[in-house]
Design a protein with these regions (language model features):
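Short alpha-helical "recognition helix" segments of helix-turn-helix
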Residues: 21-23
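A short, Lys/Arg-rich alpha-helix, primarily the initiator
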Residues: 1-15, 25, 52
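Recognition helix of helix-turn-helix/homeodomain-like DNA-binding domains
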Residues: 27-43
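Short, charged recognition helix plus adjacent turn
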Residues: 61-78
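DNA major-groove recognition helix of helix-turn-helix/homeodomain DNA-binding modules
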Residues: 45-65
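Helix-turn-helix DNA-binding elements, focusing on the entry/boundary residues of the two helices
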Residues: 8, 19, 48
Length: 78
């Protein structure tokens, strides 16, 4: 799950969503988002769904991209 923060940062930048906006919709402090996107902490597995749900409210395409990228990064390399 170490790549979740990298993926979140990419999605936020691609879709023009601020860390503050995501934090507000999630009902958490912006510092949590900051730690995730700067790889200082990994979001808990339950937070992945909360991130998806918040992104869905802000921009459904961003939510789809986040989950698709996260699932793709979870597949073992062959």
């Amino acid at each position: 799950m170490a790549k979740a923060g990298i993926i979140l940062k990419q999605v936020l930048e691609t879709y023009g969503i601020s860390q503050s906006d995501l934090a507000k919709v999630m009902g958490i402090q912006r510092g949590n988002i900051h730690r995730w996107v700067n790889e200082l902490a990994d979001p808990a597995s339950t937070a992945i769904i909360e991130i998806r749900d918040a992104l869905q409210k802000i921009n459904p395409a961003a939510a789809r991209a986040f989950i698709e990228l996260w699932l793709d990064s979870s597949e073992p390399e062959t």
